[in-house]
Swiss-Prot record:
Keywords: ATP-binding, DNA replication, DNA-binding, Early protein, Helicase, Host nucleus, Hydrolase, Isomerase, Isopeptide bond, Nucleotide-binding, Phosphoprotein, Ubl conjugation. Phosphorylated. InterPro entries: Helicase_SF3_DNA-vir (IPR014015), P-loop_NTPase (IPR027417), PPV_DNA_helicase_E1_C (IPR001177), PPV_DNA_helicase_E1_N (IPR014000), PPV_E1_DBD (IPR046832), PPV_E1_DBD_sf (IPR046935), Rep_E1_papillomaV (IPR016393), Znf_lg_T-Ag_D1_dom_sf (IPR037102). ATP binds at residues 479-486. Residues 188-354 are annotated as: DNA-binding region. GO terms for biological process: DNA replication. Can form hexamers. Interacts with E2 protein; this interaction increases E1 DNA binding specificity. Interacts with host DNA polymerase subunit POLA2. Interacts with host single stranded DNA-binding protein RPA1. Interacts with host TOP1; this interaction stimulates the enzymatic activity of TOP1. It comes from Human papillomavirus type 70. This is Replication protein E1. The modification Phosphoserine is found at residue 92. There is a cross-link at residue 560 (Glycyl lysine isopeptide (Lys-Gly) (interchain with G-Cter in SUMO)). Gene3D superfamilies: 3.40.1310.10, P-loop containing nucleotide triphosphate hydrolases, Zinc finger, large T-antigen D1 domain. Its EC number is 5.6.2.4.
Amino acid sequence: MANCEGTDGDGSGCNGWFLVQAIVDKQTGDTVSEDEDENATDTGSDLADFIDDTTDICVQAERETAQVLYNMQEAQRDAQSVRALKRKYGGSNLNKSPCAKPPGVHREQRVTLQELPVNICNKQARTNVYSVPDSGYGNMEVETAEVEVTVVNNTNGEEEGENGGENGGSIREECSSVDSAIDSENQDPQSPTAQLKTVLQANNQKAILLSQFKHTYGLAFNDLVRTFKSDKTICTDWVAAICGVNPTIAEGFKTLIQPYALYTHIQCLDTKYGVYILLLIRYKCGKNRITVGKGLSKLLHVPESCMLIEPPKLRSPVAALYWYRTGMSNISEVSGTTPEWIQRLTVIQHGIDDSVFDLSDMVQWAFDNDVTEDSDIAYGYALLADSNSNAAAFLKSNCQAKYVRDCATMCRHYKRAQKKQMTMAQWIRFRCDKCDDGGDWRPIVQFLRYQGVEFITFLCAFKEFLKGTPKKNCIVIQGPPNTGKSYFCMSLMHFLQGTVISYVNSTSHFWLEPLADAKVAMLDDATGTCWSYFDTYMRNALDGNPISLDRKHRHLIQIKCPPILITSNTNPVEENRWPYLTSRLTVFTFPNAFPFDQNRNPVYTINNKNWKSFFQKTWCKLDLQQDEDEGDNDGNTIPTFKCVTGENTRTL
């Protein structure tokens, strides 16, 4: 016979059948006991207490009792700690809270809460407790009382019969003792919190803070700072005076501020308002007054109304000396690198150098950097104040505008005299020294050949042009529009630093005044009217002979007209209207349009580097080598200009 599924066989293993034999002692006809009911149904209720679980229930009850007692004690301690902390750090804002009530109301509420029974579970009473307004700082006693009542209600449970009265009594006694201590502190007018409340309630808080700062530190706060009218002005260095700081927080503040700053100088002195902190800080990035105030308020738990925040004085030796001297004393905690403005104002040599301004040093700087405009001189020299003591003294002076005008005037005088003493060859050499190397002369020659100009012919005319030979003192580049006439001539003027005159100013008597200080001049796009003016008034100028110039607010001056380069769409030689200009002009024609590549870049690049290479290549052809043997001991054809006293170089 096959085995049944899921079994190990009949009578084998643990799944087999077993026989149960019941032994019945009672037989039919025996007398039934009185405490037995024959008609009763067997419900199994007689087995309810079959297992003895009294031991487990007792153990569980003991554990719950201990846990409830522990929770109650912890809640007591937490409530006392919260009350003490709120009293310390939040008491100053109690009266300023919009939800705060007069002190009498709080005392009445505290009395009412103390009179409540500990086992209170009335919904109406609990609603009254929760309805007390809170601003976040005030009403600390009400909050703690509410916490204690709730804890007792949750923890008493079944045990309030025996221990409820004792626990409730102890809680009420502790609450009463703490509240009485708080009331006594509130009533003490000499406590730091009460003193700080007077500051917060004052009409002019800043005046009280300034007065207390001077009384504490012995100097005025404004002696160390300069005023920023806007709260949004950004600065990296700030000075802050914080009043009413808790001593414990003030001690930890020295460590908490380190991640935000590159330099800190902290002083802490005790006052009747609490700890008064004086802080000089350099942040890692620029911040405005609002950001600084929020950051310090978060670290110190002090409202921003108890702070004075301004940037330090960066040019006051007295302020810098105060930070320097107090930084070496034991009342200050200093960390980081000392700011450069403190070092500059406290080092003796720097103080001596900064006190004297030398105009010649400023003129020498402007001359060496070829700066002659007033605005450029003022801005450029002011940027050197961090590294140049004379520039720092210039910024301290009240006569900056006068110094700038005098410097620009003297620099122009020196530049004009230097240019006047140079020959054309020296001037070209001087301009070549100002340019970088790496140019190529070939694009210039290729462009002339592209326009059909013979290079040798142009070179001969250009040599006479640079020498200022009479009747050869003017070169005209004429041709159709867009042939590169202005591009070619303007690049040459830029390299030689020539002067450009415009016929649009011809109605003025002074439109030719720039020719007085020029080595080379240019007039762009001369029209028929302009050629008529030249034919009438400027024949001597085109000849290269001396002419008389009228200058504004000055006497007439007699000069030899510099070489003039003119561009025009009209060929004056072919016109019969100006027969007297034919012998005075050397004309080159550019007939072809200027070429560009596919990217609209010039095919022939003409710049300062290429012109330098061109002059170096054709130096002998242009007959410019006559001044090479003339020079100073250093081999320079141009003497070095110095308007300051030289310094002896110390040899090692």
